[in-house]
Amino acid sequence: MATDLQVTTNKLSNKETQLTVKVPVEKIQNKVEGRIRQVAKTAKIDGFRKGNVPMSHIRSQYGAGIQQEVINDVIRDTVFEAIKSEDIRAVGMPNIDDVKLEDDFLVYQATVEIFPEVDVQGINEIEVERHTAKVDEADVDTMIENLQKQREEFVEKKGKADKGNQVTFDFEGSIDGEKFEGGSAEDFKLVIGSNQMIPGFEAGIKGMKAGEEKTIDVTFPEDYQAENLAGKEAQFKINVKLVEKSKLPEIDDAFLELFGVKEGGVEKLKDDVRKNMEREIKNAARSQVKQATFDALLEKNEFDVPNAMLEQEIERQRNMMMQRFSQQFGANADSFDKDMLPNELFEEQALRAARLGIIVARVIDTKGLEVDQARVETFIKEAAENYEDPSEVIEYYTTDKQQRANIESVVLEDQVVDYLIEQGKVTDKEVSYQDLLAAQQQQQQAM
């Protein structure tokens, strides 16, 4: 810090500090004079040749504006220097006010939101339930059957449509004899049992044959998204064109090769599937206990969050949702109108995330936790196993500093969870593979 800069601080609250900064006016005057001389070289004033305007005229016409520019520059150049000199962990941009020339100093006040100094409560009182699961033979068989279903084909079937069959049909809907928008389609495909349509629709088609026509009566749910249809009784004329049954692929060499199995047959596929499921269990269990631990800690720690921090988190979550939209609908995230996603939509989750970030940072600081590089290497290696060329992925995460920093942040957060679990009480509960993965999916959707 420049030795001629004077700074005093006044802590307004746990999340805000005010600095009074004094800069010697001589520093400003020197810069003002320098700029006036620069302006004089090119200034054009009637009655004088370019470069020959008297300095008194330059000061009279440009002096006030130049002085204000210099003051703004000096404030911009010194405010962060002042914040740093006081070891203040600022959040967001400082708010400058009360700027004045006083005696031999430029004096201004900078109000800045600060990272809250939270005394984390309840670390030794945490009680969480840690879910665990095992992969049995039936789970592996079910997963392989799901792999088959992902590549299922439908072949024509003679007879009535039953659960699992795919039906191709035309339909025409009406309410009180009047057609309505979106109520008709041709060559519509529906798998019986998929619950894709409103209640009663599939039941009306089940049992029909190709070439058969009939009218079914259904009632739109009260909470149906189209308000003009909610709770209304409707009639649909159905014309079935084709009934097909599912045909799963045989587990032969061609099928095995789809999953990278060239040797070892079905047993090798089962072994690969089991290992992948065990990785999923490990990740899901880790995610579950982390969520439970953080939830328990948040219940015991409520505090105000700096507005800038909350706004940053809201914007981060909004951008994440827009990215999901772009992936889902195949559009550029920039094409979505942000006004469709108001702050209120994210405030609750953003406040939780901001508080959690502060708590985690305080635990790291107070307990002196440092990232375990061996765990970082293990994390990268395990993540790379999911790719066709693990070595390429490992090299990417090893050489890209930003990506490695992201992983280090995740690993350090895991270390915080480990520390918290060691201080608290954990009870293990075994659940099924399906329940554990379903809970993880619900957790991710809520984020």
From Swiss-Prot:
Keyword Transmembrane assigned: no
GO molecular function: peptidyl-prolyl cis-trans isomerase activity; protein folding chaperone; ribosome binding
Database matches in Gene3D superfamilies: 3.10.50.40, Trigger factor ribosome-binding domain (3.30.70.1050), Trigger factor, C-terminal domain (1.10.3120.10)
Subcellular location: Cytoplasm
Catalytic activity: [protein]-peptidylproline (omega=180) = [protein]-peptidylproline (omega=0)
Superkingdom: Bacteria
GO CC, alphabetical: cytoplasm
Keywords associated with the record: Cell cycle, Cell division, Chaperone, Cytoplasm, Isomerase, Rotamase
GO BP of this protein: 'de novo' cotranslational protein folding; cell division; chaperone-mediated protein folding; protein transport; protein unfolding
Entry EC no(s): 5.2.1.8
Enzyme category, top tier: isomerase
Residue stretches making up the PPIase FKBP-type domain: 164-249
Residues that span the membrane, as ranges: none
Family: Belongs to the FKBP-type PPIase family. Tig subfamily.
Role played: Involved in protein export. Acts as a chaperone by maintaining the newly synthesized protein in an open conformation. Functions as a peptidyl-prolyl cis-trans isomerase.
Free-text comment on this protein's domains from its UniProt entry: Consists of 3 domains; the N-terminus binds the ribosome, the middle domain has PPIase activity, while the C-terminus has intrinsic chaperone activity on its own.
Protein name: Trigger factor
Source species of the chain: Psychrobacter cryohalolentis (strain ATCC BAA-1226 / DSM 17306 / VKM B-2378 / K5)
Gene that produces this protein: tig
